């Protein structure tokens, strides 16, 4: 996962990351069907949809297009797998953890294949897919594998002749809807804790990027998870996504995506069976650079924080607040970084920025860039598409940005860095919190008092101090306000996938 300076830590026993392998340029896509009950199925409608390589705009393949009847079939399989007495329910907790470890082993074995598929489907650099996405996926499966036999209740002292204790039980059938920006990693964030706790899953990958989810399904079958435990239905939001969100036999849903769609998911969940909902939504994240900060570190982290993954991150540092004493120097260095950022073929090991995911996202970003120009921000570099490069956008930096500009208010989800100026801490706290979002924030300062004050005052689910995008499977992640609710990762994620049952037993006499 990303470290303080945008590099990657690997966690290998010798501390050395594996060498970057060559991508598999002519990789055959083997898995394109719906995965239910450990078998591959054609859609009941007979429809298919195409998935495209954003880098070349060429069609990769066609994938079976699921719909409500396919979701119903998947839920039926998941329910059967969760029934008392089923192979999955009879499996002890230690064995569940071993299956997750074995799944991580197979992901490690096929890491180059999965990274290649991710790069083909998303356009993200192979370097990042291999060292960030796949590394995080493997670590997430291993982390929750370790938790499987450690989920336990408590004995509760009472003032009566009873024994009182709690049981933490799996919820049942869990729905999951994953985004296109980190397809496999976000799948792992949802699948690993759900399986760790003993649930079954019906998952919809984003229609733009279904290929790694379907490949993972083949590994789930190879490992030996019982039929029906994991079911994957590719398709579109208004059909498959809506069917999962509103299904009366799905007991919990986890969604990562836009705030607008998150509202629809919550509404559908409420109208159906009041299923439990975890939402990880958008962000307009402040990155605060104080005058006493290590400017080299702050510039690099802010750069990686907004341009990583083509800017297509809910955690993007999309509002950089810089104290006025160092504002000019920060802008100058940021422009230098942006101009040097390698943009191009995502399979080239030197590339750090690939294309945007699709034409819709590409057009939205360019429209917001134009709004920045019209509203008076100073365009320092970039500001347009790459010539003759399809969906590629030049790394863009704006200075003299004010809070009322659209680029300072709206989630751009692209390679655009708006830099704002502030005078003092109280001012920047108020401005940073003046948003409907509250996903992440970052602070750069050498002063511990400032760091702690800002960490407490910022209305965000995560605050990074002198680092950015520092994710760990052990650390909970989620948002305040309209950035969502619930937590993924860490011990906190287990509560999202378990029900707490209180058991009280009457005794003849009080135990001492």
From Swiss-Prot:
Tissue expression summary:
Detected in embryonic head (at protein level). Ventral retina.
- What is the uppermost EC class here? oxidoreductase
What's an example GO cellular component term for this entry?
Answer: cytoplasm
Query: What keyword terms does UniProt attach to this protein?
Result: Acetylation, Cytoplasm, Lipid metabolism, NAD, Oxidoreductase
N-acetylalanine sites (modified residues): 2
Q: What Enzyme Commission number(s) appear in the record? A: 1.2.1.36
UniProt cross-references to InterPro entries, sorted A to Z = Ald_DH/histidinol_DH (IPR016161), Ald_DH_C (IPR016163), Ald_DH_CS_CYS (IPR016160), Ald_DH_CS_GLU (IPR029510), Ald_DH_N (IPR016162), Aldehyde_DH_dom (IPR015590), Aldehyde_DH_NAD(P) (IPR012394)
Site annotated as Transition state stabilizer: where? 181
Q: Source organism's superkingdom? A: Eukaryota
Q: Which residues form a coiled coil?
A: none
Q: What happens when the gene is disrupted?
A: Mutant mice are born at the expected Mendelian rate, but all die within 10 hours after birth. Lethality is due to respiratory distress, caused by choanal atresia, i.e. the lack of communication between the nasal and oral cavities. Mutant embryos at 11.5 dpc lack detectable retinoic acid in the ventral retina, nasal epithelium and in the nasolacrimal groove. At 14.5 dpc mutant embryos display shortening of the ventral retina associated with lens rotation and persistence of the retrolenticular membrane, indicative of retinoic acid deficiency.
Q: Which reaction does it catalyse?
A: retinal + NAD(+) + H2O = retinoate + NADH + 2 H(+); all-trans-retinal + NAD(+) + H2O = all-trans-retinoate + NADH + 2 H(+); all-trans-13,14-dihydroretinal + NAD(+) + H2O = all-trans-13,14-dihydroretinoate + NADH + 2 H(+)
| Molecular functions (GO terms) | 3-chloroallyl aldehyde dehydrogenase activity; aldehyde dehydrogenase (NAD+) activity; aldehyde dehydrogenase [NAD(P)+] activity; NAD+ binding; protein homodimerization activity; retinal dehydrogenase activity; thyroid hormone binding
Annotated localization: Cytoplasm
Q: Where is this region: Disordered?
A: 1-22
Q: Where does NAD(+) bind?
A: 204, 207, 257-262, 361, 411
Q: Which residues form the active site?
A: 280, 314
What pathway is it annotated to?
A: Cofactor metabolism; retinol metabolism
Write out the similarity annotation.
Belongs to the aldehyde dehydrogenase family.
Q: What does this protein do?
A: Catalyzes the NAD-dependent oxidation of aldehyde substrates, such as all-trans-retinal and all-trans-13,14-dihydroretinal, to their corresponding carboxylic acids, all-trans-retinoate and all-trans-13,14-dihydroretinoate, respectively. High specificity for all-trans-retinal as substrate, can also accept acetaldehyde as substrate in vitro but with lower affinity. Required for the biosynthesis of normal levels of retinoate in the embryonic ocular and nasal regions; a critical lipid in the embryonic development of the eye and the nasal region.
Q: Note the subunit structure.
A: Homotetramer.
Q: What is this protein called?
A: Retinaldehyde dehydrogenase 3
Q: Which organism is it from?
A: Mus musculus (Mouse)
What gene is this protein a product of?
Aldh1a3
